[in-house]
Amino acid sequence: YATSGYPRFTEAARYWLQWAGFPEKVYSPSQGKNDYTDDYKCRGEWVNYLAGGSDILPDSSGLNVPLDLAFAFHSDAGTTKNDSIIGSLGIYFTGKGRKTYGKNTPRQVSRYLTDVVLTQIADDIRETYEPEWNRRGMWNKSYFEARVPEIPTMLLELLSHQNFADMRYGLDPRFRFLVSRAIYKGILKFIAKQNDYEYQVQPLPVNHLRTEFIGTHEIKLTWRAVEDPLEPTATPEKYIVYTRIGNGAFDSGTLVSDTSYTKGIIPDSIYSFKVTAVNSGGESFPSETVSLCRCSQEKGTVMVINGFDRISAPDSFEIDTLMAGFDTRKDFGVPYLYDISFIGEQYEFRRNIPWIDDDAPGFGASRADYETRVIAGNTFDYPYIHGRAITNAGYSFLSASDEAVTDQLVALNDYRIVDLILGKEKQVKIGRGVTDRAFKTFPESLQTIIADYCENGGNIFVSGAYVATDLWDNGDVNETDKRFANEILHYTWRTGQASVSGQVKPAASPFPAFDTLHVEYHNTLNENCYAVESPDGIEPFGKGSYTIQRYGENNIGAGIFYRGQRYNTCILGYPFETIKTEKQRNELMNAILSSFDQTITHQ
């Protein structure tokens, strides 16, 4: 025997159960002779061992855990050469001869469990992202995982991991959340029905977060509740505010009844907040994180806007029935927080190449060099990174979500400087694109607010990988978008995919603060920060706008600075928060903020 050396998140059930301390009869029914059969057989044995000795399985020995049900989450195989979706299948087993589970529960109950969960999944997917999602039906078959557990059991085959049309959805974090919530709702409804009680579904995360100073040593945090259009019971009743000071951990939270929270602060300390919504059904996922700091010797206050909301699957393409796939080198997508499922780049794009062997899997085949690695995604915590650099430069800062700004809940004109975080924000579709594309860098409402802010003398710093490509090369070009970039922010698009080196060097300009700054940003997949595969090449537009940075390998413009009579702008074609070292982030932020305050030096 030899250990794999792989992380435990890749571990099969058989070895996880052994490591967790379960007896050999549970994790290895074959007594060590067959890992493959042990892996699928041990799951049902594990369920029975957990429940053994409890009220639901009193005649067996075990850990006395009164389980309500067992649920096995699978994906299936199967391909189509077009946009057809394989879809979802439910499997249960009502038994041959034995019509009840351990405590005389009818085995027919498993059919009801399967039906309610499968119905919830299909209904929610069809209502949101894919009206043609295929509900394949329900099978009453003697699969080991369905037959052996002595409690109501369902096997779900959610989609085909082998089919491109299915995986366009399956790789998207938004779809994963929707399906996971649907499964949770289906199980909740089943348990409530079995026990004859009313249920309530946990709320969705709150949005519209914003912070403000209401005194020298006090701040106010506000947000909005989010109703669930798919579930009327998921209404928030209260909220929990979690606080982090500096780079410490978040506290255990403060329960509040309203959609606002005030707190005393200590100057020169960075405070960060995230909020969850709660009701009798449970607690929502956390909101994005907003941060702030009151500097005791402040030069001014910067408003940081988090406009990086995107989570999505990798870029994908299809050429009729001939070729299709995911182009992770162009855009890996954006995982929610992190991803552990990516194994490597796809290399076989020909639809007609069949599966021959697991080592020659045909269409969709991918490399295996990332099987053991964790890939960083969107942490929704970037105001903190920007804020550290801002406070290092001597400025206080507040932060807000972009929706709070576009809904005019934040008065930008109260702040001399704005820092807009765009990260890898860009317009993307989900699946085959039935619904409108999401995550536009500069929606019309934001353009209007930024234009008004600039015309009233504001200074704005914007950084993001698609600050220009999303306006010029998105498949649906809008001349108004381009005019906004040209005439308000004073930059123009040169090219997407401008660099692969991850290195930026200074360019000759009238702004001496940038003359010696070299920057290196994350351009490959890693566990610390999301990667920028395709930064933007941008150029200055109009009088007073100059290139201040270029990409290291080709001299394509990476950043511009505009000094006008009424306002200033600084635009970067790569995200500021992806810069690898805090020293480089501090130096660049200081150069930007100080240049906003200085008179232009003519060459």
Language-model segments: what does each one mean?
Residues 54, 69-99, 128-196, 573-578:
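Active-site-adjacent mobile loop/cap segments within catalytic or ligand-binding domains
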Residues 142-147, 535-538, 548, 552-568:
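Short, surface-exposed beta-strand/loop micro-motifs that present aromatic residues
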Residues 190-233, 281-300:
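Pro/Thr/Ser/Gly-rich low-complexity, intrinsically disordered linker/stalk tracts
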Residues 251-258:
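Short beta-strand segments within Ig-like beta-sandwich modules, predominantly Fibronectin type-III
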Residues 424-532, 545, 552, 588:
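A glycine-rich, often tryptophan-bearing local segment used as a flexible ligand/cofactor-contacting loop or short
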